[in-house]
Amino acid sequence: MASSTRIAQRYASALMDQALADGTLEQINSDFQYIMSLVRESDEMVAVLNSPVIRYNAKVGILKEVFGSHVSTLMMNFLIMLAEKRRESILPDIAASFTEMYNEEKKFIPVGFTSAVELDETMRATLIDTIAKRTGKTVLPTFSVDDALKGGITI
């Protein structure tokens, strides 16, 4: 396990603990989804997060301007703390670790289904129900079609 992954897990765990204590778990999860959607869409945001040249005060100003009115106080304080500790470049890893912890806490299991043809609603429901019964978790499904498959389904 890479060092940055362990560090990201520690930050995610601390944020998870605080969100559970504050009763803001759903809001923090929503905040991460919003933040990561912007990061995925913006090369400029990735450059800001990864830049060692941008000073702390400037970075905090950018984070407040971009996210301030869209995320909770806890998340904004967390982002500022990451900038202060110069850990903002691992934000995507922290978000991924947090999402794993969130899914575990909520008993969600993400499952990807790939089939040779589009599955009808009955087949989709049967697959989801079968996996939910076997795992005891709520399935978060994604479905895709791969013409290269000769038949069947990969999970």
Q: PLM features: what roles do these ranges have?
A:
Residues M1-T154:
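Elongated, mostly alpha-helical coiled-coil "stalk/stator" tethers of large membrane protein machines
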